[in-house]
Amino acid sequence: MTYIVGLTGGIGSGKTTIANLFTDLGVPLVDADVVAREVVAKDSPLLSKIVEHFGAQILTEQGELNRAALRERVFNHDEDKLWLNNLLHPAIRERMKQKLAEQTAPYTLFVVPLLIENKLTALCDRILVVDVSPQTQLARSAQRDNNNFEQIQRIMNSQVSQQERLKWADDVINNDAELAQNLPHLQQKVLELHQFYLQQAENKNA
């Protein structure tokens, strides 16, 4: 059975950058965001239920889910957010567990932004946190997504605090620095962790 390394971090922490460095080394990954998009793909049963609940205005002209419109809707309505989570989370969890079970590599990177919040830590053998300051989170997220600060702050408030996330960490990569200057350091850190995780996987399956 594949050894599972859970990769998590708050909004704007650079999880994708770190995940890509692992995939450059040939490590397979199961990405919660990808799975979340798959379960609400065009013409899927779950998307039909979402449209039934929220109306067709949460669809794009192509009939796909308009994630920004849906995010705006649920962030302002706690009951709608609860309904949506109750619909999606079980389906996403099952799909992720299925994908993890299919992996045959020594270890698999399990990329989940809300790993701790959604109580998915039990699926992991080890947890790697990409850590940045709240100030970096705000600046990066605003620059990347064109989101306003208020919406980013709401997203940050819905996630566990930096301190709480670090309590769960077995390993930490600090990603506060600008990527251009920090890339060699990140590559070295990821390579070291890669060797370590291969050893851990070997020990587990011995």
From Swiss-Prot:
Regions annotated as coiled coil: none
Transmembrane segments: none
GO biological process, one term: coenzyme A biosynthetic process
Subcellular location: Cytoplasm
Domain of life of the organism encoding this protein: Bacteria
EC numbers for this chain: 2.7.1.24
Keywords in alphabetical order: ATP-binding, Coenzyme A biosynthesis, Cytoplasm, Kinase, Nucleotide-binding, Transferase
Pfam family, one: CoaE
Stored SUPFAM superfamilies: P-loop containing nucleoside triphosphate hydrolases
Pathway: Cofactor biosynthesis; coenzyme A biosynthesis; CoA from (R)-pantothenate: step 5/5
Catalytic activity: 3'-dephospho-CoA + ATP = ADP + CoA + H(+)
Span of domain DPCK: 4-204
Any one GO molecular-function label of the UniProt entry: ATP binding
Positions contributing to ATP binding: G12, S13, G14, K15, T16, T17
Cellular component GO terms held in the UniProt record: cytoplasm
Function (record text): Catalyzes the phosphorylation of the 3'-hydroxyl group of dephosphocoenzyme A to form coenzyme A.
HAMAP family xrefs: Dephospho_CoA_kinase
Family membership noted in the UniProt record: Belongs to the CoaE family.
Protein's recorded name: Dephospho-CoA kinase
